[in-house]
């Protein structure tokens, strides 16, 4: 009998651990000693010592990582050996799948997906493109059909058909012809056939692209029409039929199921990054970069420019109301006009009369209304406009309404126009459009009112007869009242008999007074025209005295 021990089986778990450790130890390269000569400069020597310390620290870190990796491999090999030695087939299969998934996730390269953000951005860009084109088509056909942009126009009645046509055209020009949508092309992505796992990307087949277009274009159209039909069958106040209720319930369940499946697929997409949507997963179509030569660089130049301009515009909107841009604008405009006038005039022309921009306009035309409604700025252009019958000089639109005149030049404008211009200048004055004077105030126009000139008392004294007539009338009335009272006291029995005679006498007296007043008024007017007011007033007083004497005798 020999003392030799039987050879150990290499497939046993106990033999796997030292083999893995030996392999890891043998695969780890041993760094060769490097002869380094220290420099003679003290500063260089100090930096050289620091570099050596950093190099030693890196080697120690690398050795620690290698030891940790070897220990992890040993523990993993032991776990795999235990799972393989398990008696349950289900446990062995489940453990192997779990370990395979863990290896895929924890490996350095992972699942090697294309950029998830790029794929999601591509989908968002495609949807925004469709919505943008729908908006443009809606604006184009806005006033057809119902008219006025209401709810009965073509955009709302044929919304599903418009979406179908747009999606079909976009699908033909993008995926069917170039294997990529516009959003995917902007992200440097293309659809590939995920059934092929080679290093060369294979474009999807025609049946894959055809099914993709049928589901994304035709499927969405049919689903929207189906939902619209169910909504119409609802009937509002009437209860729908049992068939419609069952169909609505089935539709809701399908929608819920599709939403749940899409959510689960999206979670898997976030983990693996292969299939963006549920349809891509079913058809085995994935987005991948067609070439790896294009580097992904993020530039913030556009974003920085937008932020700067946004901040600058907000600053201007905050500062301009405080600065008073209107006042500065008026000041600059006034300064520019004065400068032009000084440059255009010479020294001998300074004594000429000031003339405004619209001095050629007739008096009945408001220069401000004309400036707002007409482009003619000189007399030649005005005559041309009048000849072609296109001017507005003599129209009711430019005639002066509620005339007001400026102070001190006295030019006439509309009240609203003139007050608006003066108020707009905020007390700094407004240049008259007719004469060029600086206007700060205005007043009602007095052109239709004729003011009487008062004569000097040194030349002639005018006595008004109205005061004299009023005084004489009061005296006559008082005398008549006294006479009547005396007659009543002396002859109380004859009051009834003489009442009628007295009334007749009073009527005759009043008539004579009225005749005298009219005669005196006519005589007064004629006397004023002949400049003989003094003599006529004396005659009038004499007549009044005679009339009073006659009344006393009566």
UniProtKB/Swiss-Prot annotation:
Q: Which UniProt keywords apply?
A: Membrane, Metal-binding, Peroxisome, Protein transport, Transferase, Transmembrane, Transmembrane helix, Transport, Ubl conjugation pathway, Zinc, Zinc-finger
Which pathway does it take part in? Protein modification; protein ubiquitination
* Database matches in InterPro entries: PEX2/10, Pex_N
Topology relative to the lipid bilayer, per the entry, is: Multi-pass membrane protein
EC main class here is transferase
| An annotated Gene Ontology molecular function | transferase activity
Q: Which residues fall in a compositionally biased region of kind Basic and acidic residues?
A: 509-520
Does the UniProt entry include the keyword Transmembrane helix? yes
Q: Where is this region: Disordered?
A: 1-63, 470-554
Record field: compositional bias (Acidic residues):
485-508, 521-554
Residues annotated as binding Zn(2+) 1 are 366, 369, 414, 417
| Record topology, Cytoplasmic segments | 143-154, 232-241, 324-554
One BP term from GO: protein import into peroxisome matrix, receptor recycling
Q: Which reaction does it catalyse?
A: [E2 ubiquitin-conjugating enzyme]-S-ubiquitinyl-L-cysteine + [acceptor protein]-L-cysteine = [E2 ubiquitin-conjugating enzyme]-L-cysteine + [acceptor protein]-S-ubiquitinyl-L-cysteine
Signal peptide residue numbers: none
- Write out the GO cellular component annotations: peroxisomal membrane
Tell me which residues bind Zn(2+) 2: 409, 411, 432, 435
Predominant location of this chain?
membrane
Give residue ranges on the Peroxisomal matrix side: 1-115, 181-204, 273-299
In the record's own words, the domains note is: The three subunits of the retrotranslocation channel (PEX2, PEX10 and PEX12) coassemble in the membrane into a channel with an open 10 Angstrom pore. The RING-type zinc-fingers that catalyze PEX5 receptor ubiquitination are positioned above the pore on the cytosolic side of the complex.
Q: Which family does it belong to?
A: Belongs to the pex2/pex10/pex12 family.
User: Which protein are we looking at?
Assistant: Peroxisomal biogenesis factor 2
Identify the coding gene.
PEX2
């Amino acid at each position: 009998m020999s003392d030799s021990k039987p050879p150990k089986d290499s497939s046993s778990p106990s033999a796997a651990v030292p083999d893995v450790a030996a392999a890891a130890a043998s695969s780890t390269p041993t760094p060769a000693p490097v002869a380094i000569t220290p420099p003679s400069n003290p500063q260089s020597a100090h930096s050289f010592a620091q570099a050596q310390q950093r190099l030693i620290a890196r080697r120690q870190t690398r050795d620690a990582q290698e030891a940790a990796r070897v220990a992890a491999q040993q523990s993993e090999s032991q776990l795999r050996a235990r799972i393989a030695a398990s008696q349950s087939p289900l446990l062995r299969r489940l453990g192997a799948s779990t370990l395979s998934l863990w290896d895929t996730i924890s490996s350095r390269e992972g699942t090697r997906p294309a950029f998830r953000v790029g794929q999601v951005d591509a989908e968002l860009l495609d949807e925004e493109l469709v919505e943008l084109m729908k908006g443009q088509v809606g604006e184009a056909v806005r006033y057809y059909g119902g008219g006025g942009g209401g709810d009965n126009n073509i955009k709302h009645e044929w919304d599903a058909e418009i979406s179908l046509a747009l999606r079909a055209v976009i699908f033909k020009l993008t995926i069917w012809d170039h294997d990529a949508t516009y959003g995917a092309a902007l992200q440097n992505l293309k659809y590939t056939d995920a059934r092929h796992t080679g290093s060369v990307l294979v474009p999807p087949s025609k049946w894959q692209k055809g099914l993709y277009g049928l589901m994304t274009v035709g499927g969405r159209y049919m689903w929207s029409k189906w939902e619209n039909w169910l909504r119409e069958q609802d009937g509002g106040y009437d209860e729908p039929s049992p068939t419609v209720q069952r169909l609505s319930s089935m539709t809701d369940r399908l929608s819920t199921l599709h939403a749940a499946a899409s959510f689960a697929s999206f979670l898997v997409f976030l983990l693996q990054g292969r299939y963006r949507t549920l349809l891509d997963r079913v058809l085995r179509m994935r987005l991948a970069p067609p070439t790896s030569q294009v580097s992904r660089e993020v530039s913030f130049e556009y974003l920085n420019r937008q932020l700067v301009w946004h901040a600058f515009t907000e600053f201007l909107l905050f500062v301009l109301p405080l600065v008073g841009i209107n006042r500065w604008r008026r000041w600059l405009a006034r300064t520019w006009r004065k400068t032009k006038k000084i440059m255009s005039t010479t020294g001998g022309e300074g004594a000429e009369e000031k003339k405004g921009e619209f001095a050629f306009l007739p008096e009945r035309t408001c220069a401000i209304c004309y400036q707002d409604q007409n482009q003619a700025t000189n007399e030649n252009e005005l005559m041309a406009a009048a000849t072609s019958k296109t001017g507005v000089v003599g129209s009711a639109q430019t005639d002066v309404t509620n005339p007001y005149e400026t102070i001190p030049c006295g030019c006439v404008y509309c009240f609203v126009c003139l007050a608006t211009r003066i108020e707009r200048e905020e007390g700094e004055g407004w240049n008259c459009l007719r004469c060029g004077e600086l206007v700060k105030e205005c007043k009602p126009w007095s052109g239709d009112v004729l003011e009487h000139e008062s004569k000097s008392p040194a030349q002639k004294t005018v006595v008004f007869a109205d005061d004299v007539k009023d005084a004489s009338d009061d005296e006559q009335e008082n005398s008549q009242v006294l006479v009547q009272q005396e007659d009543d006291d002396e002859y109380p029995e004859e009051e009834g008999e003489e009442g009628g005679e007295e009334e007749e006498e009073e009527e005759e007296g009043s008539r004579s007074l009225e005749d005298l007043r009219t005669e005196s008024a006519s005589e007064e007017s004629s006397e004023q025209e002949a400049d003989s007011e003094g003599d006529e007033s004396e005659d009038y007083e004499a007549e009044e005295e005679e009339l009073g004497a006659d009344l006393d005798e009566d």
